[in-house]
């Protein structure tokens, strides 16, 4: 699946950079072009792999390249004002070769939170391809303001995109971990899942073709209808002697290695499917609230047992209660792992999303009460120095 990628704000740009790095490392080819936007020039300079000419600073006349802080309303206003400048990011891009457009953004801060929905709206107005958001939710300890920003931005992004891939920082943060290292680790978790999803329909360098291909239409159909999705992934390392060669001790001793390998393959694949869904989702949720699903099993071709792939697909069907769960395999001849990726589309119940919304509502109520209180205080202070019995000087 070919994607044209946009990174909005600091977090969005960093995740985009991480995806490009992962694509290079895995010798894949699914990103047709990459564009980064920011209101802070320093954040654009900090990127490594997004081409220099594709790093676009906007809102400079208002904030002079220093960013908007956590003011996502200002970011949205600047993005709307500079919308033509944002769209120039697609001028040199091979848009016709892209199956979909992807917008990365941290939803708790300012620039990404406010400007990502604006960019999505304008791309939707011009292009036929589906527009997907990748929304990074703040952890609970990042504060009420970030939750308020995230709740408003997530709602806006869902409204103007064809689907939103959600990633919950709070679910993946390790206590005591260095902040920069934590973000790098979480970015890697996210881009590995997206990279496998997008690469799974491509023909491998070895020329090996999947028995059940997961092409772009399968992904697009899983995401149709809008909403929020979550992605799980789990992998099992193969024994060193089996890492792609199909060698086994039982075969060496004259036994039937194929039956042993088949049983091992089935066990590994079904176990990793359960792990992916029950503990490795980018956004923890009620699995039975998903409307659709997609299962992709990757690894050396001889380990991709059709029976196991079908069992895994059926199990996800049972867990979600959906009859729209697709399945396929992604052969990787040089891999020493068997991995399972599970995409759950249109998830309607997530405790973390509900918590963010609740915190946001409370923060908004507190904000309005403070505004009303400040206005009353100003009025009281004015009465102390103003006497209506005196004529105005002007």
Swiss-Prot record:
GO biological process, one term: cell division
Keyword check for Cytoplasm: yes
Pfam families hit by this protein: CetZ_C, Tubulin
Keyword Transmembrane found: no
CC terms in the record's Gene Ontology section: cell division site; cytoplasm; microtubule
Reported consequences of knocking out the gene: Does not affect motility. No differences in growth rate or cell size.
Positions that bind GTP: 10-14, 110-112, 142, 169, 187
InterPro entries: CetZ, CetZ_C, FtsZ/CetZ, Tubulin/FtsZ-like_C, Tubulin/FtsZ_GTPase_sf, Tubulin_CS, Tubulin_FtsZ_GTPase
Gene Ontology MF annotations: GTP binding; GTPase activity
Keywords: Cell shape, Cytoplasm, GTP-binding, Nucleotide-binding
Broad class of where this protein is predominantly found: cytoplasm
Cellular location(s): Cytoplasm
PROSITE patterns cross-referenced by the UniProt entry: TUBULIN (PS00227)
HAMAP family (alphabetical): CetZ
Record family assignment: Belongs to the CetZ family.
Purpose of the protein: Involved in cell shape control.
The protein's name in its UniProt record: Tubulin-like protein CetZ5
Organism annotation: Haloferax volcanii (strain ATCC 29605 / DSM 3757 / JCM 8879 / NBRC 14742 / NCIMB 2012 / VKM B-1768 / DS2) (Halobacterium volcanii)
Gene name as annotated: cetZ5
């Amino acid at each position: 699946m070919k994607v044209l990628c946009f990174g909005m704000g600091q977090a969005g740009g960093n995740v985009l950079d991480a995806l490009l790095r992962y694509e290079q490392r895995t010798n894949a080819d699914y990103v047709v072009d990459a564009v980064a936007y920011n209101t802070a020039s320093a954040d654009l300079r900090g990127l490594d792999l997004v081409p220099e000419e594709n790093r676009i600073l906007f809102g400079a006349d208002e904030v002079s390249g220093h960013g908007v802080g956590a003011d996502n309303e200002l970011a949205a206003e600047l993005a709307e004002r500079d919308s033509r400048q944002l769209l120039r990011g697609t001028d040199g891009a091979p848009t016709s070769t892209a199956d979909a457009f992807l917008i990365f953004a941290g939803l708790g801060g300012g620039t990404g939170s406010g400007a990502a929905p604006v960019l999505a709206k304008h791309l939707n107005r011009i292009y036929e391809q589906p527009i997907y958001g990748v929304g990074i939710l703040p952890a609970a300890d990042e504060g009420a303001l970030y939750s308020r920003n995230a709740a408003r931005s997530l709602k806006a992004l869902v409204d103007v995109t064809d689907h939103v891939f959600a990633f919950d920082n709070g679910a993946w943060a390790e206590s005591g971990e260095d902040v920069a290292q934590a973000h790098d680790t979480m970015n890697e978790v996210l881009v590995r899942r997206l990279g496998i999803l997008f690469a799974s329909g491509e023909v491998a360098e070895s020329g090996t073709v999947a028995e059940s291909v997961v092409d772009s239409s399968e992904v697009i159909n899983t995401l149709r209808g809008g909403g929020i999705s979550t992605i799980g992934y789990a992998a099992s390392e193969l024994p060193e002697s089996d890492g792609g060669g199909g060698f086994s001790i039982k075969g060496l001793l004259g036994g039937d290695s194929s039956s042993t390998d088949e049983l091992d393959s089935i066990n590994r694949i079904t176990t990793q499917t359960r792990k992916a869904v029950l503990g490795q989702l980018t956004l923890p949720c009620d699995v039975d609230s998903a409307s659709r699903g997609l299962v992709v099993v990757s690894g050396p071709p001889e380990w991709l047992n059709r029976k196991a792939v079908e069992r895994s697909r059926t199990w996800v069907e049972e867990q979600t209660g959906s009859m729209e769960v697709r399945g396929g395999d992604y052969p990787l001849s040089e891999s020493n792992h068997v991995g399972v990726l599970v995409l759950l589309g249109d998830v309607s119940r997530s405790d973390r999303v509900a918590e963010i919304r609740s915190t946001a509502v409370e923060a908004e109520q507190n904000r309005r009460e403070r505004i009303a209180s400040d206005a009353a205080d100003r009025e009281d202070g004015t009465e102390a120095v103003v006497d209506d019995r005196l004529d105005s000087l002007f």
